[in-house]
Amino acid sequence: MSRSGDRTSTFDPSHSDNLLHGLNLLWRKQLFCDVTLTAQGQQFHCHKAVLASCSQYFRSLFSSGGGHPHALALGPGAQDGLGGAPPKEPPPPPQEEPGTPSSSPEDKLLASPRAINNLVLQGCSSIGLRLVLEYLYTANVTLSLDTVEEVLSVSKILHIPQVTKLCVQFLNDQISVQNYKQVCKIAALHGLEETKKLANKYLVEDVLLLNFEEMRALLDSLPPPVESELALFQMSVLWLEHDRETRMQYAPDLMKRLRFALIPAPELVERVQSVDFMRTDPVCQKLLLDAMNYHLMPFRQHCRQSLASRIRSNKKMLLLVGGLPPGPDRLPSNLVQYYDDEKKTWKILTIMPYNSAHHCVVEVENFLFVLGGEDQWNPNGKHSTNFVSRYDPRFNSWIQLPPMQERRASFYACRLDKNLYVIGGRNETGYLSSVECYNLETNEWRYVSSLPQPLAAHAGAVHNGKIYISGGVHNGEYVPWLYCYDPVMDVWARKQDMNTKRAIHTLAVMNDRLYAIGGNHLKGFSHLDVMLVECYDPKGDQWNILQTPILEGRSGPGCAVLDDSIYLVGGYSWSMGAYKSSTICYSPEKGTWTELEGDVAEPLAGPACSTVILPACVPYNK
């Protein structure tokens, strides 16, 4: 109690508890809720005031109006919304560019003033969000080793440091001999250095007791016991130093099992070269020198891959790069996302140096090349680019490579032997017939034989040392053509036409067959989804229509083959008038379509897909 003249100020210590209890009661009874959060299809009705008082993210979003964030892509480089109101009279899709509509009914939904009250939180798990909301309304959070990672992820995405702190405290208190490996993995994923050090103490204690054969087996194991190659090296040094007189004879053998090229050059100098036997032992000296030389030539690393430079994993993962979201602003995405098969969800891996859609990606020795595309939507190709970038998943880094000689979007790119090929497309001059070839070793572009006809929005695939190009648009007309390029002879040959004209489709190779899937064609002035799936036999030069059509129309999806299935991600459905955020999967062996759990961060048309091997610990939401 404090006095000032005839006034008295009295503090009620129970008021904050009573207020929180009252808010929790309103939440439990769903009274006066003014915003709905959706995560993994589950809805949570909440109060904006509560969210904004605890979360910097929501505070900024609600105070700024948040655009129209019907669906939020949360993570590095994510945008707050999908776009604003469409033009008063949206123009019809131009015939010469069939791939992406100028507007859709979904644009009107996104432009609704009420959209701010319904937020789809892509990248947040429903379990994690529920537990975080319980904390906001009760000051209590229920954690276990099975749920703490999801809670931690949501708290970091939504910028709620109090919950992050509680998660860290829980992990630090829970570390034991039985669970330190699991805790160490969680700590590595989320950059929790203190927790990682505590967990590693248990690991080191176990490792020091191993004999030589057990230590050697540990270094060869997949996945590795620690999150980085440097940590693996340091663990090996500790083992050797623990009984130096007896164990130092094993140093060369153990060092051969390490992949020094996976350690960044500065750390090789500061942390590896500083260890005495790495400078004095001839075998260790050579291993270090080879790694240094590897890092000196970044533009040729994709030509110098060996076991010493490959990620310690053998599991390929599905990647989605860029794409065009709905909305009249039509700014392409710069996100690179990957599908976590264990969690059944798409996660943000990194961001590109620029925004892009209608581009191509090509995997080369587990490096991802991103070529061309457009950084703004324009039906006449005014914003087509000639950019070429290479992504390195080992270090989460990008480098710029020599640009293509022509700007191009809606084209096809592939790898064949030691070359990349880019074929056709469109730019401000119109449709292209030109074909460029990039030598992966010399880092140079050159022209090779052009397509017989200018084409854009076509699909392509590589089979048996040759490149196949199907469909597309030629001078505004959809075509069923199939061309085959022989790189040895540098000639194009016309093959049997498809049964259906189509563009903005995909062409995938499996079991010596080419599958033409998705796309659309024109009937009068109307775009129609192509539902038929066609299969081509290169030996017999014959197309067959399969009995199982595609699940739903998909124009401009990302496409990749993984294991025994063909994956289509995103795209646009003309029959539904909607951009897609889901992933559908076709099994040629079973002849069936399925839909994967989990959506990408936002609906997209014109993204690109590939498969790469990622490190065991992917810090996807740092």
UniProtKB/Swiss-Prot annotation:
Gene for this chain: KLHL14
Keywords, sorted A to Z: Cytoplasm, Endoplasmic reticulum, Kelch repeat, Membrane, Repeat
Keyword Endoplasmic reticulum: yes
Composition bias type Pro residues, residue spans: 87-96
Keyword Cytoplasm: yes
Official protein name in the record: Kelch-like protein 14
Signal sequence, renumbered to the chain: none
Species in which this protein is naturally found: Gallus gallus
A GO cellular-component term linked to this record: endoplasmic reticulum
Residue span(s) of domain BTB: 33-145
Region (Disordered) residue spans: 73-108
Kelch repeats, residue ranges: 317-366, 367-418, 419-465, 467-512, 514-564, 566-614
Primary localisation category: cytoplasm
Taxonomy, superkingdom: Eukaryota
Subcellular location: Cytoplasm, Cytosol; Endoplasmic reticulum membrane
Classification of source organism: Eukaryota, Metazoa, Chordata, Craniata, Vertebrata
SUPFAM superfamilies listed in its UniProt record: Kelch motif (SSF117281), POZ domain (SSF54695)
PANTHER family reported for this sequence: KELCH-LIKE PROTEIN 14, LD33804P
